[in-house]
């Protein structure tokens, strides 16, 4: 009986216990759930909890303090709730991680050791359970079985997830996946309060009781300090392994318990482990652990080393980690001790150790212990995972000597990681290396096992390239990627190979294999990995899809990284990484999986608790969130790593990456690099890539990538490219493309190939990446494709790369890619620009920064950029895109802002890391540049929508010069695609602007682009921009030429390479005769008439470019926000194109740095590039500008003047000879200018027209302007004065380059200069205007001829030398394609005109050149070019004025200004461009145009006349229009719309400007518009103007809508074809032809419909309606405030006319309403596309921008027509949507933009008639841009 009673009692007791346990479980679950709910709170509480919960908890306390870790720790605790806690993906990864972690920890359960292992991420209990469970569930019991390994794996996954998603548990929970329950159970079981001794005796003993083994572990784990000491206790390690688990677990016991079974295994493991640990682990640890630490550094977040501040704990951890054993233990120990951090770190370390194994072992599970290796391997992998870098790196790095790559990937990804890679990585990664080596030793590891590890690793690692580790790894495959490679290679297949697969497999494979025993694990890894596989992992990040995440992570290894770590791993990797680290650790440890649960827990805990983890790391937000599969790509980075060069770009990138590492931005990606690594890395293609770049190409890149892909890895060029591309995701994609090689390439990636398969990539990569993947996929495909060639070439990368295909194709496909590719190749090949490749990869090494995109954005900007436009934003989007942005993605501003800094440094983080890199990258790759752009842009492109951009971009996308460039370029360029850059983001886009711009504008784009790109930077611009200019046309062109070249020369030779040829040519021309270097000289040279012309051209180019920028900017409005994108892009694309060559030097475009702001660099770049830059016509600019640019660039400024000068940040860039350019630039470039100008200023610029830019450029401008002035041969004295000024300004600029001069000062200077110029120009214009003017390069008369011949012709004209010069020739072709620009440039001397004119030409297909005079004047050239189209001398002017770049006009402002002194004042004041007559002030309604009698007005310049009001040709239709245009142009602000200029009514200009700025300018408009004024009569003229200018955007039809707009007929024509046919708008000629149309449309004849533009959202619709009703009953009142337009129909035309008169320029609220007549056609169009379309139409932004611009500007016909002219076709189609949306006018505009021909190609509509047209649209765009842009801006 008694026995029974006892039994009963016992039973009761048991029941009670059970209930108690259940209760606890429930509570824990609830807690977790609650915590989940209250994540924020949970974070800290959780942390506390864990501390309290278990000894470990206490130990972890510090980690808790760590904050991030703490949070994570909490999460692990929260694990049980895994299922519940399964964090919805929607939670931003960053938060998610934190929350989740917190939650887990919060669970209250002490984070079990496994948790610790996970780094806290995973949750202790779940460690096994969750991890194992989930994994098990997936993987199965095996995992569980090998709890340690498994759990870790799963945990890892979980951790990863957790980190990201909180999946940690989730992973386990990830988990929660299906296994949740299990995990929960396990969790339950596992999770025990430290206090829960009863339940968890283990735990209870955990501290004291844990087995001795445990104890040891515990101790070591428990106390971080201890840990350290434990470290020494490698022995502990033995236990450690087992112990590890234990240790890891908070409750060792728990762990043990959980591990229990493990323990034995563990023991075995332990011993092995220990050995391993010591050995491998040690090694790893060293590597990993240490690395961890170091790598942690890499992890950035993880390692204190890396980010001590970020992860204070980490530091500890590192220390803790010291002991290899400890590391092992560390898992557990760490948990305890640093708990999350240490644990994590240690774990990482462990992992590292594992990795070491992995390296070897991993490679095989082999390494010493199977177990160990497995474990270790796992660890290793894990490491990878957690430290993908590490892991990967290790493996990679290790494996590879890539290390670098590896490192890159991981390293890059994670600083720590890299370090982690440590040896390899480290080696590769410098820092990493350091870390690695030192890092390895870094932390205790180093000391401890570090040595071993170090040795082991180090050798290899360090060797990095070598095999050592490699070997070991290699065994894995040294392939370079080696490690990864191997992995990827298949190698191992599995191993990473598999994993690599996507990397996914990456770990997977690796894991798989390695796990060997760990089959499960493997499975787990595999499974999860696989699925998650990288993807998963990525997913993880992305979705942190499963615990697998871990696997994933692993796979992704970074997959995980990807996932959680993903990003962390990846660039951000830190978090992720760390997470990954954690995970990794887990994985690793887990892998060891012996002690699964504990391990998991420990790992989780560790992970979670890791203080060292930066939450950002965990978060997937920036990057991570994106989950771009960048990781994967990043992997590639690895390879590059080795390449030192990579570093270069990479550097930037790397840095970025590294830096980014945390960053998120690309870094992240890079971090991912790990991942990438895997994928890439692996591939790394290194090989392939390698070849190209380093193998690194990819690898390099990879590394870079890691860094940023493009990172370029360093530059990798490809990476660059891709990086760039990747830079944003897209970039990636793109990058990929380039990769293509990757992908396809190798297969280029080889593995990637797999991917390359696209799939692989895609899959792996892509997938998330999508951008990549997607893009990638696409990209890949694209890459491949785009890569197109890439693919094609498998080497693709290389090949492709090499091939222009890339360029081309890439471009095409991916612009970026293509571009990249091309560029890259070129770049690559040319080292000059290797950079090119380098651009991406190459020279950019630094450039990679260039790549900015790549890097940053691109990478982030990277965006990835996959060309994909896909991501649209890519750059930007993603950040910015990543971007950029995203990381610090500068919006580009930075990048350019800092020209000097440029160095790639900046900015964009993108470049930051690579900033330079990217840019250079771009430059390097010119194509790539483009590509980049494209890619990025492309990617961006999606973003493309940037406002008009999109339209542009898109259409551009294709071929049209614009398009193409645009597209790609744009996308690349930014415009098109994007979006712009950023980032995109990278970038980045996005970049659309860039793209579009770039593209479109070739020149503009170029200019802008690069600028945009930041030219770089970012790549985004770079991309496009870089590509930009020419690119614009051809993206490649831009991208290519520009970027690449620029970079090299710019950056590299700065002046030399590119400079030399240019200089030579200039010298020949006399322009540059004195000194390339010397801006002064240059300027002086320019003094000569030739010079003048050239300058003019320069100016023009600049202007154009600038304008473009502006235009783009404005136009896009979109970009503006992103300075980087916008500014850069804007400027860049055009400029880039234009200046690509310069870009090269500057890298502005190419480089991004100096150039970035202005495309000019790119232009030059382009030129070298040769013809891809059709737009390089800008080349003309380049030509004109080039000299200056040379000087400027040499000066350090950005290339072309425009770019450079205006903005060139660093360079004082005399380039700005043309005022207008600066103006233009000011408008757009400001962003580019950013270095010199603040973003806000930039924003103003658009409004101001050129002033800010001008001023910004200030000294730059001055010199440029001066040069321009000096160009005015008719004013010798003036020339002398100008020379003096130039000298002064050069000096000033030097200062300014340093950004020392305040904007205000600069502005003042510029204003003064502008005024001088204005006056002089006015005189000149008048003189020239008369016949002279005509003679001015009107010749480029044939729009196309102009364009086509432009190079030769235009060049001949003023720039024969230029022409001769390579770049120009490049331009030539570019020009040809760009046609317009070149012509503009060339004709107008291509200089001033070039930008504007080019743009205009481009848009309109007219030769801008004609307006040399205009050029001379202000932007006269700019104006002229536009007009040139018409063919009449004034045509140029028309163009200029029309300038369709109205905005350009701004820059052209000079020309414009003078013409409209008064108007200028109004707007001008704002712009404060001296060039512009004061009367034209941006904010003020312009009164001037209307009153100005061109004949009598002293201020009138051809440009200002627009139609040549003052000019005798006024009679000329063109002239008249021109004069109006000019006036409008004067608005310059309205850069976006040349049409204002084109339109007689200055309002137009004003509208632009104002529209931008808002109506201030419009009033003038109004008058101007009076129906008759230029209206009908000039209709013809107008027409012409419009045609030319159409872009001019008659924003203020006012009295009379732009010709045609009002007229239904014209409308039709415009809309339909007339314009089209004429293409007036649509076609460049069209304008002329349009004349009749115009006349029709022109007829201002009032219609029943009135379109009100420039409305702001603040306007009260009812009030507006009431006001409108005062003039008559409204039959229709359609208000679209989003577009800033209102479409009103009166019952009679009289009422409509009355209302128009009353409403036009009416100030309502905070805006000035522009009222224009709209034809039924336009209206229908407007209505049809109005709202929806607008947004839809290119970008909604653009739409908005356009629309609003258009609307605003086009409000009435004027706008419309202008638009029509402009974008007419496009407009409508594209713009149309945007514009269309606007209103009838808009419609017209729409049509302008959209469908209508015109830009058709450019714009969208293809009216493609003229690709050159592209230019036209550009000009148009600018006008519109201005308006819209301003708005946007």
From Swiss-Prot:
Where is it localised?
A: Cytoplasm, P-body
Polar residues bias: start-end ranges: 143-153, 224-253, 267-289, 327-345, 401-414, 462-491, 527-538, 574-586, 618-630, 737-746, 756-767, 809-820, 900-916, 927-941, 969-993, 1202-1212, 1627-1638, 1748-1757
Biased composition annotated in UniProt, kind: Gly residues: 772-787
UniProt-listed GO biological process terms: miRNA-mediated gene silencing by inhibition of translation; miRNA-mediated post-transcriptional gene silencing; positive regulation of nuclear-transcribed mRNA catabolic process, deadenylation-dependent decay; positive regulation of nuclear-transcribed mRNA poly(A) tail shortening; regulatory ncRNA-mediated gene silencing
| Classification via CDD domains | RRM_TNRC6B (cd12712)
Modification sites for Phosphoserine: 879, 1432, 1461, 1816, 1832
Residue numbers carrying Phosphothreonine: 1449, 1464
Membrane-crossing ranges are: none
Show the GO cellular component annotation of the record.
cytosol; nucleoplasm; P-body
Positions of the UniProt region annotated as Silencing domain: 1218-1723
Disorder cited: Global developmental delay with speech and behavioral abnormalities: An autosomal dominant disorder manifesting in infancy or early childhood. It is characterized by mildly delayed fine and motor skills, mildly impaired intellectual development, speech and language delay, and variable behavioral abnormalities, mostly autism and attention deficit-hyperactivity disorder. Additional non-specific features include facial dysmorphism, myopia or strabismus, and skeletal defects.
Q: Which family does it belong to?
A: Belongs to the GW182 family.
Name of protein? Trinucleotide repeat-containing gene 6B protein
Q: Which organism is it from?
A: Homo sapiens
